[in-house]
């Protein structure tokens, strides 16, 4: 039965999940510019276009044939790489989290004083979410699915371990230096940072309509960014 075959993408991710080095995704435009037999390039192009499709229309509304047309591939090729529409959707979710964690790992937080490291982490999270609206929208879609597809992922928890480990180290250094207060949970700190940065994007349109403020204006965004940083730092500070 075709559904029993392990998709190419799943095999590759299972083989590489423990690897610290992952090539950055190539832009879809690059994937279209040169027709090659490079699976990495082909999958990167499919994932980029599929992210927009799923973010715009959700899992039920997204069309594989539209993704195939936009990437100049075929439905058959997409199914070969990802197994099914649901498999592609899960791959897009995993890839979105993986890319965020990859960039996050380059922040060199361990080289900064604890409070500076915390500020940098909050700033990064805010900036990432503000410039990756499709990521926010697909996470919203998955929550509307009650996390059903992420629950099927074999790698999602491991992908996010480094994020919590970084906060654990940062927090431990802050405790040792006497600048952070005791009794805080690193996962809770992570949740607070994520929630504040996430809301700024997920609710920007409804918030703007209700309060008649353009939250996307550079000045408004800079003010909100500074406010969120201060909220988190003051919460953790001793």
Residue ranges and their predicted role:
Residues 45, 53-87, 91-92:
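Helix-turn-helix
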């Amino acid at each position: 039965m075709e559904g029993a075959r392990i998709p190419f993408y799943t095999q590759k991710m299972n083989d590489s999940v423990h690897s610290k080095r992952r090539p950055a995704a190539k832009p879809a435009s690059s994937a279209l510019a040169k027709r090659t037999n490079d699976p990495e390039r082909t999958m990167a192009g499919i994932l980029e276009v599929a992210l927009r499709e799923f973010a715009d229309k959700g899992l039920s509304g997204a069309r594989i044939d539209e993704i195939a047309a936009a990437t100049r591939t075929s439905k058959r090729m997409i199914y070969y790489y990802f197994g099914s529409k649901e498999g592609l959707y899960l791959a897009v979710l995993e890839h979105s989290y993986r890319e965020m964690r990859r960039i996050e790992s380059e922040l060199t937080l361990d080289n900064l004083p604890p409070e500076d490291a915390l500020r940098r982490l909050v700033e990064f999270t805010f900036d990432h979410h503000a410039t990756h609206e499709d990521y926010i929208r697909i996470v919203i879609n998955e929550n509307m699915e009650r996390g059903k597809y992420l629950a099927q992922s074999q790698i999602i928890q491991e992908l996010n371990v480094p994020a919590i480990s970084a906060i654990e180290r940062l927090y431990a250094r802050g405790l040792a230096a006497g600048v952070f207060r005791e009794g805080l949970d690193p996962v809770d700190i992570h949740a607070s940072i994520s929630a504040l940065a996430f809301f700024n994007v997920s609710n920007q349109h409804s918030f703007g309509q209700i309060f008649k403020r353009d939250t996307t204006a550079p000045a408004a965004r800079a003010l909100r960014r500074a406010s969120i940083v201060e909220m988190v730092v003051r919460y953790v500070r001793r």
